[in-house]
Amino acid sequence: TVESELKLGLLGTAPTALYRHATGTGHLFARSNWTRDALWMGFVAGRYDQSHAHQDQGAFTLFQRDFLAVTENIFTHSGIQQGAEVHNVVRFTSNGTTVRQREGTTSTMVVTPGANGALTVDADLTPSYNGNAAVGQWRRRLDFNASRLRVHDTFTIGAGVQATFQVNTPVQPFVNGRTATAGSLLVTVIEPADATLSVLDWRTQGSSEYTRGWRLDIRGSGNAFVVELAEAGALFGNGFD
């Protein structure tokens, strides 16, 4: 069958392109190579113009042989959880309430390819908050290569607003200082130096809706996050044991 031939790699040569930036929808898809063991990333920064669309501007997905980091929405009963809480973004909260991204806005990203599948992304997610004083600015830079994704966030926020870097995972994260391991995913917080990491079991938010999944929450002082995400085996294979 075609499916079997695809799995066996019998349908000709692999494409040369390693990323696709769909500018009309604001979606980026990138992979480190065309082997089964490739590190794959998805990212969103573009038009938010549908009432049923998700508040996922600035969200990333990471995959290597299986999902490493992915929206919690895929593990819900309804499949229609749209809030920022279920996506891999910086979540801004004011008085305990998540600051919403707004329909009718357009975020932007600039993609710069490098060698051997590496690329950088510079995204301005500020427009998605439509002038809300709670979020004066949010920019996200991604540095992607065959072994890891580095995420660098800078932001300005209003008084009383808290920023949380969040990573939704299919398996439970275990925290050790400023690192966390969730199955094959290793998360390392580089900034802020005083970062605290905590874990949410989504089933505690209603097991009839949230059937599985966890969220790693990273908080700290300052107006920036720098976080690296990698497949742990790749790091160990390079001698980081």
Residue spans for each PLM region:
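Carbohydrate-active enzyme catalytic cores, enriched for enzymes
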Residues: 1-69, 214, 219-220
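CBM-like, beta-strand-rich accessory domains located in the C-terminal region of large
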Residues: 74-233
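Ser/Thr-rich, Pro/Gly/Ala-heavy low-complexity intrinsically disordered linkers and tails
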Residues: 235-240
